[in-house]
């Protein structure tokens, strides 16, 4: 079985593995279910100051990461991971979803280009057929946090990461799962009564048919209230 391997291009290599070195992802890393290497873009910087950015042609605010610097670092990454698919976290990109995550895993070799400043030179995207990917309609300081987020999602989907792989079928957004791509139902555990709030009686009934019906109804109601666009295909 091929493992997931991620090559990460960044100016902050110390940010990795970060949260991915803990909990499920960290355990999976220790089991060699996935692996990673980090390339410091600044190692390919220009002059003794290791410059990696410059002013934008046409004016505008902020600095742009230079294509010659990025090109050298990407060439190095491709030498290490030659068959990899390359992704650039960007607000212009295709929105990352659970189904997109499964699509990404068709290639277990991935490169993530973490941008900084105002962004990267467009010619880099064109030259290397880089796929832009967005984690939402908001702006972050760089691509490192989106990369950590995307990798966390991908790692959870790998066989052997979750103790019970069936857990995936009862989670939000799983199109083939219990809630058909909608949001997960409300969850309860002990104590049965907490601060005068009781667990719904149906969950204590032992009647699996009624419990399943309640869960599906809850999922539909929550999805309709909070993410109605997810119901269009249900």
UniProtKB/Swiss-Prot annotation:
Report the SUPFAM superfamilies cross-referenced here. Answer: alpha/beta knot
Q: Gene3D superfamilies from the entry?
A: 3.40.1280.10, tRNA(m1g37)methyltransferase, domain 2
Does the keyword Methyltransferase belong to this entry? yes
The EC class name is transferase
Q: What Enzyme Commission number(s) appear in the record?
A: 2.1.1.228
In alphabetical order, the GO MF annotations are: tRNA (guanine(37)-N1)-methyltransferase activity
Reaction catalysed? guanosine(37) in tRNA + S-adenosyl-L-methionine = N(1)-methylguanosine(37) in tRNA + S-adenosyl-L-homocysteine + H(+)
The residues listed in the UniProt record as binding S-adenosyl-L-methionine, with positions renumbered to this chain, are 115, 135-140
Keywords per UniProt: Cytoplasm, Methyltransferase, S-adenosyl-L-methionine, Transferase, tRNA processing
Quaternary structure note: Homodimer.
NCBIfam families, per database record: PRK00026.1, trmD
Family named by the database record: Belongs to the RNA methyltransferase TrmD family.
Q: What is this protein called?
A: tRNA (guanine-N(1)-)-methyltransferase
Q: Which gene encodes it?
A: trmD
């Amino acid at each position: 079985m091929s493992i997931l391997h991620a090559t990460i291009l960044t100016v902050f290599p110390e940010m990795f593995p970060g949260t991915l070195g803990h909990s499920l992802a960290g355990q999976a890393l220790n089991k060699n279910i996935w692996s990673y290497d980090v390339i410091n873009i600044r190692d390919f910087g220009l002059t003794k100051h290791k410059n990696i950015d410059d002013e934008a042609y046409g004016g505008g605010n902020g600095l742009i990461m230079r294509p010659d610097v990025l090109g050298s670092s990407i060439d190095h990454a491709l030498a290490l991971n030659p068959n990899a698919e390359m992704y650039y976290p960007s607000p212009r990109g295709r929105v990352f979803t659970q189904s997109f995550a499964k699509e990404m895993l068709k290639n277990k070799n991935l490169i993530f280009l973490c941008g900084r400043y105002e962004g990267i030179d467009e010619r880099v995207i064109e030259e290397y057929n880089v796929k832009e990917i967005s984690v939402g309609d908001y702006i972050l300081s760089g691509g490192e946090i989106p990369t950590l987020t995307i990798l966390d999602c991908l790692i959870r989907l790998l066989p052997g990461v979750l103790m019970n792989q069936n857990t995936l079928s009862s989670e939000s957004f799983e199109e083939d799962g219990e809630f058909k791509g909608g949001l997960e139902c409300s969850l309860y555990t002990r104590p049965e009564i907490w601060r005068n709030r009781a667990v719904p009686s149906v969950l204590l009934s032992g009647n699996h048919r009624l419990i399943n019906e309640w869960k599906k109804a809850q999922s539909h109601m929550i999805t309709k209230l909070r993410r109605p666009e997810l119901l269009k295909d249900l």
